[in-house]
């Protein structure tokens, strides 16, 4: 059964460039992982200070998620990147989770 990783971020406009660069770097790694089907990076204006960014990744099934997570953790470790510290520094709020289709 296909599964979906859906992450929603509230991103201050002044953090946009740095955050999108990191998101694109992560998605480049994810696109090369076994079980990857497709992804979407979506944005929505929120107000004068921030916008919503939603990332959606479709996986063949849940068995591929741990390997993909490990690949991203390796990327972070090799580059010295700490996601929690970066999100705090950039003022980004996140709501992240893995979902399955109701109609499957």
Go through each PLM region and give its residues:
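Absolute protein N-terminus
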Residues: 1-2, 104
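Short, well-ordered beta-strand segments in beta-rich or mixed alpha/beta enzyme
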Residues: 2-10, 41-72
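Short, surface-exposed ligand-recognition loops at beta-strand->loop->(often short) alpha-helix junctions
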Residues: 10-20
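Short structured motifs
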Residues: 24, 38-41
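An amphipathic, aromatic/His-enriched active-site/gating alpha helix that lines ligand/cofactor pockets
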Residues: 30-37, 58-95, 102
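A general secondary-structure junction signal
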Residues: 43, 98-100
């Amino acid at each position: 059964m296909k599964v979906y990783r859906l992450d929603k971020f509230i991103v201050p406009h002044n953090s946009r460039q740095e955050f999108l660069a990191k998101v694109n770097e992560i998605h480049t790694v994810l696109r090369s992982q076994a079980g990857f089907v497709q992804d979407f990076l979506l944005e929505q204006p929120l107000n004068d200070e921030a916008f919503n960014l939603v990332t959606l990744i479709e996986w063949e099934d849940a068995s591929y998620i741990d390997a993909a997570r490990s690949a991203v953790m390796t990327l972070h470790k090799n580059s010295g990147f700490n996601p929690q510290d970066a999100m705090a520094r950039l003022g980004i709020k996140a709501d992240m989770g893995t979902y399955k289709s109701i109609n499957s």
